[in-house]
Amino acid sequence: MSGSCAAPGPGSGSSPAACRFAHYFVLCGIDADSGLEPDELAGENFDQSPLRRTFKSKVLAHYPQNIEWNPFDQDAVNMLCMPKGLSFRTQTDNKDPQFHSFIITREDGSRTYGFVLTFYEEVTSKQICTAMQTLYQMHNAEHYSSVYASSSCSMDSLASSLDEGDTTSLLKLQRYNSYDISRDTLYVSKSICLITPLPFMQACKKFLIQLYKAVTSQQPPPLPLESYIHNILYEVPLPPPGRSLKFYGVYEPVICQRPGPSELPLSDYPLREAFELLGLENLVQVFTCVLLEMQILLYSQDYQRLMTVAEGITTLLFPFQWQHVYVPILPASLLHFLDAPVPYLMGLQSKEGTDRSKLELPQEANLCFVDIDNHFIELPEEFPQFPNKVDFIQELSEVLVQFGIPPEGSLHCSESTSKLKNMVLKDLVNDKKNGNVCTNNISMYELLKGNETIARLQALAKRTGVAVEKMDLSASLGEKDKDLKLHCEEAELRDYQLNVQLREVFANRFTQMFADYEAFVIQTAQDMESWLTNREQMQNFDKASFLSDQPEPYLPFLSRFIETQMFATFIDNKIMSQWEEKDPLLRVFDTRIDKIRLYNVRAPTLRTSIYQKCSTLKEAAQSIEQRLMKMDHTAIHPHLLDMKIGQGKYEQGFFPKLQSDVLATGPTSNNRWVSRSATAQRRKERLRQHSEHVGLDNDLREKYMQEARSLGKNLRQPKLSDLSPAVIAQTNCKFVEGLLKECRMKTKRMLVEKMGHEAVELGHGEANITGLEENTLIASLCDLLERIWSHGLQVKQGKSALWSHLIQFQDREEKQEHLAESPVALGPERRKSDSGVMLPTLRVSLIQDMRHIQNMSEIKTDVGRARAWIRLSLEKKLLSQHLKQLLSNQPLTKKLYKRYAFLRCEEEREQFLYHLLSLNAVDYFCFTSVFTTIMIPYRSVIIPIKKLSNAIITSNPWICVSGELGDTGVMQIPKNLLEMTFECQNLGKLTTVQIGHDNSGLLAKWLVDCVMVRNEITGHTYRFPCGRWLGKGIDDGSLERILIGELMTSASDEDLVKQCRTPPQQKSPTTARRLSITSLTGKNNKPNAGQIQEGIGEAVNNIVKHFHKPEKERGSLTVLLCGENGLVAALEQVFHHGFKSARIFHKNVFIWDFIEKVVAYFETTDQILDNEDDVLIQKSSCKTFCHYVNAINTAPRNIGKDGKFQILVCLGTRDRLLPQWIPLLAECPAITRMYEESALLRDRMTVNSLIRILQTIQDFTIVLEGSLIKGVDV
């Protein structure tokens, strides 16, 4: 909007029409030649009386015939001017004119606006009147026979409420609900419409109402109607940006204004009405749904209400734009578009008296249903709240209250408002002094009903409880006509001011929220062509870094919002601005961000959730007021045209037949508006010719851009102009292609980013996804599956189409199971391992997984159950397999779905399942991490090394399983049983197993290879390697051990058996380390000093990285401390280096023996080491060291010496004492007796280096798992 003219489409610059206020004037109504044609596409019930049916309307005339760059779409305009076709009335019916607007969005995303006034005109064709009477005779014959045949009758008849014997009532009913050609006057709807490039709704409404008033007035208009229509089509220009314009209707001037280049874009729909209709709370919720690109269905009897809410909410999206299907008024013939499996914003007209519960919608799992008339909304499940919602609503409330609008909406005032309106109309009609006929007074009301003063009077009457009696309102209004005119202008100004202030509050939210977005835009391409070519493969926005920089309360909303198409397009526009002119919305937004930085310097790392109110409300309102108080441009007055005399004669109540020859073309070049722009037009023509030379490049760029910007939304808009079966089939093909492409993009994104995350865990890269992002992607996948299963449904049976399908599949399968003798497992048959003990095979069963979900009392809805089942299947790596099994029942699929449904397109379905199968390459915990309170059955198996020890022991063994979410407590293992099952609340990812026994009986020494624990719902199997003895007088004398778990990869039974046996060099971390040092044959496995120091650095570095992740994304700290490459293992290597082994002392010596000798030395000597300045510190360190060691030794646990050393390291790390203890150990005289001179602990430089490394983790708060330090009192 930077230029003086709109830019509605390619080549617009070559035509003067591009700068015109209106492009077409249209007349729609009944074609007398065609007669009455039922509107079959509207799906009307022929049981209704003929007056209640709808009939086909036609475009009777439109001027001009065509504009080259904006061709007239006759079918679409006709459909939207009269969305339900023609309607008929008699003199007893209400015939108030109705105004509504509409929008046509072309496939390239450009928009055209239509403004329609529909009124009723007397039918003069005897042929049509006779046809209507014939229809009534046929209807009455069928209707009354059915009334007397049964006690019920059709819905639109009132006869069911009458007593059959009440003859008088029945006759009244017949009189009301019939048409008699000799007695009744028949009226039919007719529409006049303006098609414009920009949404100047208020101006167009005023112009059309004045035209209607001219038709119904007793006096003919000052000039023929052609003069006014010709004037607005050809002589009224678009106001330039930042300017106001005045042009003339039939009776009064009309004004409009257009925001400047630095202001928010044009919005002429009164937000006041949208807030009054929905209420503030509801509107913010619907606004959030639109931001998250859900399916939004608006529902109202009034077409204009649908447009007002739709346009109002999309206007508030600045700087973003709705990218998907947008049909605020869905014609009755296009109801099949509600089946569209894509995000949409549509408006559906409700029939009078229709209950919401009777409205069958194809899909509701991700639907936001907005019942405008009843002030009611239904939100999807798992709905995140808008950031700072409470403060945001409070700020909006203050603006609304300032303008006298109740934040809760004005639903409760609607009944009294309606009554007051009817009183005013009745008084106007009955007032004999005004000299006007009924229709003229109604049209006057149409001029006044938008008046804020009248509206406030009605609301005040309601609030104060004043009963509005009949009074001569028309007289008082007539006496104050001049004042009323001023009030109307003031009310219009206040609407404009309210609009801009509300929009500023919304825009300020985004400005604050995305003030630093540029810092996270990834611009890797050197030129536009390479960027466009690789658009799908490139990541344009650093989402993980952006989210980690946001306040915690914002994350649920932002993590989903930055995945939307509108945000992706916004970032695309930012990147494209390197090479071409910046998008107008983006330019305004960036300017606002620059302004914020001038007044409030901020850095990306200093984000807060403190709410900052908008500070530009007054300034924005003043700019509007200045434009409306002083007109910048005045258009040419309507004038007499060169018309044939005698044609288009005025006849009250009838819209005349216009002279097409004078309306077909614009004025000659002496028009000052045309001549003024001639130079500009020639310049644009030269630019156009130049652009043709680079047309191929532009075509390529446009092609790539269209593809890049349509990711996940293959179909942008339903085509309204052609409803042939072939076009509908083609549209459904586009839906299917779009769903498949969306599935491919989502699974690829999930796969690449998840694999990237796992590479980080393996030390192969930097993290580029967080758990929050992962959860967002999975929720998005659930939404996609629901849309796929909702596409082409025969009959909807629940809010979740997927769960409904699963239930019906389950019913059929269970019937077959009952018929069979026993169920057959889908997995391989169980085989015994060499050791004789193993986990039994977990049956792979779609039905069993459904039963798990059905047993979860925490989930209350079908949508919730479907999403839980998807998460469980994904975690088990069975999603593709389960869905394939579900769809393999072809008779059921054919019963549930129409032929064009996605699930019945064989090739696309197979590709879809293949894309889902690719997700098996990565591990998800999306079920375990979400449903944290459910009870889960676990199965554990203890695998001993039978060749070296007894499989059966006489002592009493016990086990305790711990996970990220809790532990089981100590559970006794039945004697002589190595396998047990138990149920407890979800433990999350398993981390440790404590295993031990009480050392009773003769056979009390147990050599445990490993412990296996499996989650019986998700199938996740954890292996806890041990490879150590449990028993007194053997190994390190431990009666209990803490085992660190590792998740097993999915494998067959035979592979699992091999994995269960601990290889010689892959036993528990402690075992592996001891073997490498104390084994006489393991010299080659000893790490050298450099490797040990490197191991320490890596272990500490992993802990530091752990704490730099967001809290919710951190893994297990226990593994980093006690795992195979953890801190304990690294320090053990340090302490074992140069340790004098069993060859000298003739027995196994442990690190803990050295620790105890150090303690004994400190407790028996008062000698303080070298530096007297540090006496107090060293005394304190010695005291704490001795205290900790003694506490571990006296703990009521039967832990071995290696286990005690592990506890000491963990406690020293937690309490930040390790850097103080290391120099004490290195300087103690005991070290010379137990360590060789080349040992690392005897090298001062190495010890100092070790201290510095350990000091780097002192800034972190380390919380130890309870199983590690249980029973140790320090």
Swiss-Prot record:
Keyword Acetylation: yes
Domain cDENN: 263-399
Phosphoserine PTM sites in chain numbering: S49, S178, S822, S1068, S1076, S1079
Matches recorded under Pfam families: dDENN, DENN, PLAT, RUN, uDENN
Compartments where located: Membrane
Matching SUPFAM superfamilies: Lipase/lipooxygenase domain (PLAT/LH2 domain) (SSF49723), RUN domain-like (SSF140741)
Entry keyword Cell division: no
One Gene Ontology term from the biological process aspect of the record: positive regulation of triglyceride transport
Membrane protein topology class: Single-pass membrane protein
Keywords: Acetylation, Guanine-nucleotide releasing factor, Membrane, Phosphoprotein, Repeat, Transmembrane, Transmembrane helix
Modified residues (N-acetylserine): S2
Gene3D superfamilies membership: 1.20.58.900, 3.30.450.200, 3.40.50.11500, PLAT/LH2 domain (2.60.60.20)
UniProt domain PLAT: residue ranges: 936-1044
Every dDENN domain range: 401-581
Gene Ontology annotations for the cellular component aspect, listed alphabetically: cytosol; membrane
Function: Guanine nucleotide exchange factor (GEF) which may activate RAB39A and/or RAB39B. Promotes the exchange of GDP to GTP, converting inactive GDP-bound Rab proteins into their active GTP-bound form.
Family to which this protein belongs: Belongs to the RAB6IP1 family.
Protein name: DENN domain-containing protein 5B
Gene this chain is encoded by: DENND5B
